[in-house]
């Protein structure tokens, strides 16, 4: 049984401190600007600070510890060579205000990365400004708005979103000023074509779609969906959250999508969240290129230049040019993978279906909707809840006692007591087998043990609702 490292580690401001008098006198500092008291920050030795954060790191869990199967998050292992190259001084020491002639290498890298992403997705142009996936969605919705306004159709204020869409889609559309209309899935877990047909109108601006969707099911009617959307005068938006499943196998542009956002911090092996920052580049078809944020990188002979002369651009959505170091990591990853990129899709889909089948055959976890899945799948703990009073939340918490990170839970909302699992292509058969064995073992355990979990972690079961409602944002509040 796995046991987490556990330290009784206080906050930095609670560690033993030296009281040091600070001489703030200097003749050039006016009296009214001089400190009367030392700053209210911890006064610690370097060794204390290093040990503090090292201990905290040992109580954390990351992809280096083990499998991290958060559904729709693609928590694959990130090759460390990408981190190494992105940390070169040639990249870290440049400044966005430098002249173009002094950053030709970086501009060339971004130009080539754009060409790679265009080839992978079937788009005609990309912007790297968005700092994350949801930021990319927001840009995509602004592009939709600009497109319809440019074409004299500003009354298109509705964005259609399936109930299996990625979770941030409704918020992004709403922030861009659209009304969100949700349509249901059919009994196979894909878009209900009749519901879509009834919802499309001259008010429809776009349909936002993830393909495969968050159930891990490929939308096999995508070409019919594309025709219906475009016949209605609307645009088709692709959320790239699940692109990992179709890399080198299918392209959103060939399916008829007009706008795509990608997650470099997911599909192209750059760190997520606290290991970030992220990057959510947005690609478009040719007739939308003129609306992309400025500047755009173009090649002028042998030189690369930043082009601000885009009168129809929506402007900027972020300072400078985006999270360039994240782009560097993705660029290195793509160079490493080369033509083997399609194996990412093949192995991720294979791992997902292997794991899904083992869980389904266990008899403890139910698989709603059709059987064949892509890179991820969703099982339900509803049977465990009926028979033993064990919820998906309980299973997730108990997995922590096995030294394993839980999957996404309670999403998508159309599956009751959902466990959303994405093993990714970087996990071995042995890793997957061990995770399945843990899930089966939990299903067989005493319900009270599962409901009281975790018992072996440094922090026990927390009140997530209270934490969200009453955040403590600074150590001064503790």
Where are these regions (language model features)?
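Short amphipathic alpha-helical face segments that pack within enzyme cores
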Residues: 112, 138-139, 143, 325, ...
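Acidic/polar loop patches that form or flank catalytic/metal-binding clefts of enzymes
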Residues: 126-127, 181, 207-208, 237-238, ...
């Amino acid at each position: 049984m796995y046991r987490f490292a556990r330290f009784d580690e206080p906050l930095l401001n609670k560690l033993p401190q030296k009281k040091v008098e600070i001489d703030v006198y200097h003749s050039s500092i006016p009296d009214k600007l001089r400190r009367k008291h030392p700053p209210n920050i911890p006064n610690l030795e370097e060794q204390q600070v290093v040990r503090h954060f090292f201990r905290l790191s040992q109580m954390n869990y990351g992809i280096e510890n083990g499998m991290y199967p958060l559904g729709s998050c693609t928590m694959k292992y990130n090759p460390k060579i990408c981190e190494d190259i992105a940390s070169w001084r040639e990249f870290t020491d440049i400044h966005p205000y430098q002249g173009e002639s002094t950053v030709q290498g970086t501009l060339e890298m971004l130009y080539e990365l754009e060409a790679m992403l265009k080839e992978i997705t079937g788009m005609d142009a990309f912007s790297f400004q968005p700092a994350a996936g949801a930021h990319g969605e927001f840009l995509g919705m602004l592009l939709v708005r600009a497109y319809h306004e440019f074409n004299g159709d500003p009354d298109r204020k509705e964005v259609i979103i399936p109930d299996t869409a990625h979770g941030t889609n409704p918020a992004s559309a709403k922030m861009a000023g659209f009304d969100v209309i949700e349509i249901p899935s059919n009994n196979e877990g894909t878009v209900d074509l009749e519901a879509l047909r009834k919802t499309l109108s001259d008010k429809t601006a776009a349909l936002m779609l993830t393909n495969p969707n968050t159930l891990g099911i490929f939308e096999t009617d995508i070409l019919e969906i594309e025709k219906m959307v475009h016949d209605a005068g609307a645009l088709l938006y692709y959320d790239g959250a699940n692109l990992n499943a179709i890399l080198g196998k299918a392209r959103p542009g060939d399916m008829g999508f007009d706008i795509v956002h990608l997650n470099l911090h997911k599909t192209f092996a750059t760190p997520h969240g606290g290991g970030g920052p992220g990057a959510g580049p947005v690609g478009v078809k040719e007739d939308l290129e003129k609306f992309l944020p400025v500047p755009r990188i173009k090649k002028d002979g042998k030189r690369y230049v930043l082009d601000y002369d885009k009168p129809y651009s929506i402007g900027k959505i972020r300072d400078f040019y985006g999270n360039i170091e994240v782009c560097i990591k993705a660029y290195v990853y793509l160079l490493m993978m080369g033509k083997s990129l399609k194996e990412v899709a093949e192995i991720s889909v294979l791992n997902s279906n292997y794991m899904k089948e083992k869980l389904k055959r266990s008899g403890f976890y139910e698989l709603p909707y059709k059987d064949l899945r892509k890179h991820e799948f969703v099982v339900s703990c509803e049977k465990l809840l009926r028979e033993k009073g064990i919820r998906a939340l309980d299973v997730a918490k108990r997995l922590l006692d096995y030294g394993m990170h839980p999957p996404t839970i309670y999403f998508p909302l159309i599956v009751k007591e959902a466990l959303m699992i994405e093993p990714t292509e970087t996990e071995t058969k042995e890793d997957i087998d061990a995770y399945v064995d843990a899930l089966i073992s939990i299903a067989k355990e005493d319900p009270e043990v599962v409901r009281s979990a975790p018992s072996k972690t440094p922090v026990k079961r927390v009140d997530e609702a209270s934490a969200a409602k009453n955040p403590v944002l600074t150590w001064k509040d503790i």
